[in-house]
Amino acid sequence: VDAVVIATPDHWHAAIAIAACKAGKDVYLEKPLTFTVYEGQRLIEAVRANHIVFQTGSMQRSMSVFRHAAEVCRSGKLGKIKFIRAWAGDGPKPFTLETSAAPAGLDWERWVGPLPAEWLNKYNHTLNPLLDEKGKDECWGAWRWYQGLGGGFTTDWGAHMFAIAQ
């Protein structure tokens, strides 16, 4: 194995990416890279110390319509750009869901992974990584909208919008 693609739930990103770097593997990491500045600094250190090829996954930044818009802005056709505003919706909401036992077949402890131990007792069917908000098996995780598990729209869509604004 020469490289890894990391497209796990957000709270796993930093731990897996840093471990991959330390193992000498090149890394493609989906957004958001990390939850905290501290995690980001540790990731940068791991990439540099191990001479890793590292790429951030941000599909919108690579889309032709956004690349064209950036080229127009950089070309000077619009004059000197003095200000850019990017908005991506609300941040995460507090976890106030009623908790229950995780269903058979879902290794909740493994899914929680690097999160604080309190999350081991916070399962709710809404968080099931195999179910969407309507209970369909479409692997769309509502977990991303709750503090501690995801960053709400800020990290889910903000990562795209802020990258494009750059």
Question: What is each residue range found by the language model?
Answer:
Residues 2-5:
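N-terminal Rossmann-like NAD(P) cofactor-binding module of classical short-chain dehydrogenase/reductase
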Residues 9-10, 14-62, 76:
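Beta-strand-loop-alpha-helix segment that lines the small-molecule cofactor/substrate pocket
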Residues 52-56, 60-166:
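Predominantly a Rossmann-like dinucleotide-binding segment in NAD(P)-dependent oxidoreductases
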